[in-house]
Swiss-Prot record:
Pfam families: Ribosomal_S17. GO terms for biological process: translation. One of the primary rRNA binding proteins, it binds specifically to the 5'-end of 16S ribosomal RNA. This is Small ribosomal subunit protein uS17. One of its GO terms (cellular component) is cytosolic small ribosomal subunit. It comes from Borrelia recurrentis (strain A1). HAMAP family: Ribosomal_uS17_B. The gene is rpsQ. PROSITE patterns: RIBOSOMAL_S17. GO terms for molecular function: rRNA binding; structural constituent of ribosome. Keywords: Ribonucleoprotein, Ribosomal protein, RNA-binding, rRNA-binding.
Amino acid sequence: MARENKKELIGKVVSDKMSKTVVVEIVQRKMHPIYHKYLKVSRRVKAHDEREESKLGDKVKIVESRPISKEKRWRLVEILERSK
C-alpha cells in the first residue's frame, strides 16, 4: 500500500536554542473573504532537526511526520538558503 503525500512547508528558522529542535515561522498570504484584502498570516511550528545543522535565519523546507514529542509533528528536510 502506497503512502499518501505529506505536506511540505517552507519557512524561516526563528529559534534554534533547543536540542535537535528548531522553531520555524511560516508566513502565508490569505485573502479576507469579505473585504478581499490580502493579509499576512504567520504561524510557528516546532520541527525535528536530527543533525542540528540549521541556524537562526535559515530558510528551510519541513515535511509532516509522525508525532515525535508533545508539540513536534514536523521534520527538517533541507536547508534552502543559509543566513548571512
